[in-house]
Amino acid sequence: LMRSSAASDVYKRQMEKWKAAAQAAKDVIDLGIYSLYGSYATLFKNNFQNSEFILMRRYGNSSDFEKYNFPVSYGGVGGVNPSLNLVDSYEMKDGSYFSWENEENAVRPQFYRDDRLNATILLNDSVWKSTAVENWDGGKDGLGVTNATKTGFYLKKYLNEDVNIQTGGGSQGHIWPLFRLAEIYLNYAEALNEYDPENADIAEYVNRVRSRAGQPNLPSGLTQDEMRERIPVSYT
């Protein structure tokens, strides 16, 4: 009986924390001074007046971010290599899951996907600076080339495509968002899902983020566990 009571107390404290987290997120939303930026594709393109960014850090022109992350044939050293798990987490355009067991998916993994995939990651044949990236084994950006990607993928998010390293160009200033409204929406939904899983605001705020990215609304009737799985995917 004592163990049962202790477990109940722990559960109540956990629920109180989720409730407090939801309220904190809702308080930020209700300020009414932030709004989702219209285009995910240009969300991270150094707009210092971005309506979505709540807290950000600025870096000057000497960051060399492009030099350290461009694909190797473009003068970079491919520093950040996104993982296959990250690539696979992006849904299909219709909201279904991507699967390597689907023959069409496997042949063209970058086609008919959530637009945020191609806005975030340079896959094989992605067009960068008007030419196709060659991430395949034997390609100019593929395995075996010095400093080439180790995963088959390069970072695209935050990179300034106008920088030309090969002609002596350097980096430009960068903005790193530490908190943005999309995260607050999903924090709110996640916390609500834990202590009030029937609350209609859960789907409402997740779908706002999905809609901005061009993804369909979540199917209705998702269980609490299913929603736990779908909320993180909506943030990618």
Describe each PLM feature range.
Residues 5-74, 78, 84, 98-235:
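Acidic/polar-rich alpha-helix caps and helix-coil junctions
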